[in-house]
Each structure stands twice: as structure tokens, then as C-alpha cells.
């Protein structure tokens, strides 16, 4: 897993974890601003590296590898941890592992594991697998479903490029792992956690919101008006960078 760093001269370290079917490049527009204030660490997660073919492993394996990498680099604490969608699942698993202290964590439409019998939830994995496999064969539909004026041209093309590179095993592992990775019933962390989501995806995220509320009762939930899944970070990078920096700089009295 290759890891990209920006703003290494800064003391405050922020780890950014990208969505499924997009690459680390989704953060490049926002990173132009954020790197003036933070040391940014942006991994290219397995099966999503535009420059290197790597197989997808699992949410928990990725979190463990990142935790080990941070320890080896002597990074014992993160000023901020941000993950969107699949990246949010990895962020949750990092919190559960507890290898690195986190001051502030933002879970943006983070996927949480299903709390239902495995035979049923595997059906949900299959449904999402088939949707993505269909999209891989009809990339024009991706451009139609995610218009560049809302999600940004670069993000839409990045999505199509990553989908074109992923094989069927990677697609299956991504969704099966995101829906079934292990988490404790109650997560103990000193991090201040926010869960972001777009108002247009509320019903898709309702179970995730409920799960996070049980896991982390002190979580602040923030809805972004007129936004779909990952639209705020992908389509409004300047506003996203400003809002993330604002969230990371809150002190205890602001929470």
C-alpha cells in the first residue's frame, strides 16, 4: 500500500481515507489548501491505486497495516482522522484497534457492518457486487448518474478509471468486507467523533447512523443539504477543506 504525504513540515498530522471505487486523488483539490496547515497522510488503499495493481484485502487488514505504518514512523497521535464511505469503515476500525491516539475523527457516510444473520447480509453484498459489475460494463451510466457539475470532472473520471481496473474479486471483497468487518459492541476512544452525511443519502445511511450512535453515543451528526453520497468532499473541495479544518480546530468548549 503506497502512502502519499503532503505538508510534512507541519506538526499536526491528519490521515485521509478515500472512498471505494475512487482513488487517493479524490483528495488532491482539497489537499492544496489543507497542506498549508497540516501534515497530510493519504494512502492509496488496496485495489484503488491508479499507479499500481494491488488486490483488495479487508477493512481490518488495511486498518492494521496503517496502524503499523504509523507506529513505525513514530506517529503516536493523529490530530485528525477522516474517512469517507469505505474509508470511514477503515477509520472506525482504526479507532477500535487503538494503536494510535486520535484527537478528532470525522466519519463521512462511513459504512458500518450489518447487524443481521450472515446468510441475509451476504445477499446485500451480492446486490452491491452486481450493481458495480454492471457499472463496470457501462461506464457511460456512471457519468450520467454522477454529473461532473455536482461531483467534479476529476472525481467522475477517477471513478471510471478505478472501476475499469478492479477485477471481480476485488469488487466482491470491498463490499463483503465493508458489510462484515468486526467491531466491538461499544467502542472506547478519547477521540471527538463527527458523522457527516448528505441529506440526499439519509435513508441509505440510516442504519449506519443508528449503529454509530450505539457504538459512540457522544458522536455529533452533521447533514449537508442537497448532497448525495461523497458529494461534499468530491464536488465541493474548497468548502470541504474549510469545514474539515474548522472541525479539526474545535476545542472542547465548542463540541
Question: Each PLM stretch: what is its role?
Answer:
Residues 41-80:
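Active-site loop/oxyanion-hole signature of alpha/beta-hydrolase fold enzymes
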Amino acid at each position: 500500500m503506497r502512502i502519499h504525504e503532503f505538508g510534512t513540515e507541519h506538526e499536526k498530522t491528519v490521515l485521509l481515507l478515500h472512498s471505494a471505487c475512487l482513488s487517493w486523488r479524490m483528495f488532491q483539490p482539497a489537499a492544496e489548501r489543507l497542506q498549508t496547515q497540516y501534515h497530510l497522510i493519504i494512502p492509496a488503499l488496496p485495489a484503488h491505486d491508479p499507479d499500481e495493481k494491488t488486490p483488495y484485502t479487508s477493512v481490518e487488514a488495511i486498518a492494521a497495516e496503517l496502524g503499523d505504518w504509523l507506529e513505525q514512523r513514530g506517529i503516536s497521535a493523529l490530530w485528525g482522522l477522516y474517512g469517507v464511505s469505505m474509508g470511514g469503515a477503515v477509520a472506525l476500525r482504526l479507532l477500535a484497534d487503538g494503536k494510535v491516539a486520535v484527537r478528532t475523527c470525522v466519519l463521512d457516510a462511513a459504512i458500518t457492518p450489518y447487524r443481521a444473520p450472515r446468510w441475509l447480509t451476504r445477499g446485500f453484498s451480492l446486490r452491491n457486487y452486481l450493481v458495480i459489475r454492471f457499472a463496470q460494463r457501462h461506464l457511460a451510466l456512471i457519468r450520467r448518474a454522477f454529473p461532473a457539475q455536482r461531483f467534479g470532472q476529476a472525481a467522475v473520471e477517477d471513478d471510471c478509471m478505478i472501476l475499469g481496473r478492479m477485477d471481480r474479486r476485488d469488487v466482491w471483497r470491498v463490499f463483503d468486507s465493508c458489510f462484515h468487518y468486526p467491531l466491538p459492541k461499544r467502542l472506547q476512544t478519547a477521540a471527538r467523533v463527527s458523522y457527516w452525511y448528505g441529506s440526499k443519502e439519509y435513508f441509505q445511511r440510516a442504519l449506519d447512523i443508528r449503529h454509530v450512535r450505539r457504538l459512540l453515543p457522544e458522536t455529533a451528526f452533521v447533514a449537508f443539504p442537497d448532497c448525495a453520497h461523497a458529494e461534499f468532499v468530491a464536488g465541493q473541495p474548497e468548502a470541504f477543506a474549510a469545514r474539515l479544518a474548522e472541525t479539526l480546530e474545535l476545542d472542547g468548549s465548542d463540541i
